[in-house]
Design a protein with these regions (language model features):
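Core catalytic lobe of class I
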Residues: 1-151
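S-adenosyl-L-methionine
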Residues: 153-167
């Protein structure tokens, strides 16, 4: 999947920088029905997600405040290409594909400066916008599904009453 995405991105003008592997440690499904301890049709599970880092012009960011809020320990740990932490509950968030706040928090602090704008073109439950605003960035999110826009707005208002979101 990552190679396919990178190939398509390059064809439309993006440049590849790197890949981060998120090792989602708490995945519960370990076998598919009918394949338990049988060579007939075992299901191999890979509890990882790829975060493909792409850019358009120059990799080095030259605009913005250049005000960092990442600590030395965060930088050293997060520039390692494998991140391991648990996923998020679908039931708790109310979205079929949630991810924990830690995931966008790391990406936001590693790849943007304080005051930058963070765009999430797949808003979903609002996790990325929530973390952008919580980390002194401007969070902008869009989604084709109005119910997820409403879910994101409600979640952001509930989890951080100081944030404003216009839908």
């Amino acid at each position: 999947m990552g190679a396919d995405l990178t190939t398509i991105a390059k064809k439309i003008g993006w440049k590849y920088h790197s890949t981060i592997i998120w090792n989602e440690g708490n995945i519960s499904r370990r076998t598919a029905w009918g394949s338990w301890m049988s060579a007939s049709a075992p299901y191999v599970i890979a509890p990882v997600e790829l975060i493909v880092i792409l850019y358009k012009k120059d990799w080095k960011k030259i605009n913005g405040t250049k005000l960092n809020d990442i600590t030395r320990d965060e930088f050293m740990g997060w520039t390692n290409g494998v991140w391991t932490f648990n996923g998020e509950s679908k039931k708790r968030i109310g979205h079929p594909a949630p991810f924990p706040r830690e995931l966008p928090r790391r990406c936001i602090k590693l790849f943007s400066f304080v005051g930058d704008t963070v765009l999430d073109p797949f808003l979903g439950s609002g996790t990325t916008v929530l973390e952008a605003c919580s980390n002194n960035r401007i969070g902008v999110g869009v989604d084709v599904d109005r119910k997820y826009c409403a879910l994101a707005k409600q979640r952001i208002e509930t989890e951080n009453s100081q944030l404003l979101l216009k839908v």
